[in-house]
Amino acid sequence: MNNNANLKMTQEQQVIETMRRQGGYATLRRLNEVMDFSTWKTKTPEASVRRIVQNSNAIFRIQPGLWALEESRDIILRKFKIQEEDVRSVELFSHAYYQGLLLEIGHYRNLSTYVPPQDRHHLFLDKELRELSDYEIIPQFTFDTLLRKARTVDVIWFNERKMPTHFYEVEHTTDIKNSLSKFYELQDFYSSFYIVANECRENEFNDKINASIFSPIKSRVKFITY
């Protein structure tokens, strides 16, 4: 879109038109990458885009950081296999969405990434998670007994020596204690541990992590909200 066309459109219209060109949906990061801000008289265009997607009646939120056009709602939800009344379909999409974000962040930090076999064909936007994950098979960084635990963790980041630096478990409705038990088994590695969940589960996390059995890892496990 040329600058003359941009001058005739409001900022909201420009955001909507950009989302159309992206297929009717986009992450906030993607919008900021492809938007032409040359005619915007603001020093903080990214903040303006955030305000627009949050307030526009023409745009709806699929997940935090992921937005779509109301005019394309049915098409987009079918594309992502989301049935709004089906809690399970929403959970499956959300789980893969946050796994995909974690894989992308790992790449930005120049780390290698892994997702477990059972999740590799789940969709992150228009790609399967396997396309974002560096390792199809988890690196053999320890004994088989511990690898069996590690290979079920939702996302792992590895350094250049193929040693794990970060373990992430994405929790929607499953028992957080199960994830903490995995981290407990993996505590001897020089790694950080994270539970990624809705903020409404933070009290549950605090209750579980304060159990005496998890005292050796309490200071190393962090809770991250969506």
Language model: regions and residue ranges:
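Charged low-complexity interaction tracts in eukaryotic proteins
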Residues: N2-Q11, S38-E84
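Positively charged, polyanion-binding regions of nucleic-acid-associated proteins
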Residues: N2-R29
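A short acidic, leucine-rich amphipathic alpha-helix
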Residues: R30-M35
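Nuclease catalytic cores
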Residues: V49, R78-P117
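Catalytic cores of nucleic-acid endonucleases
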Residues: S133, P139-V153, N159-T225
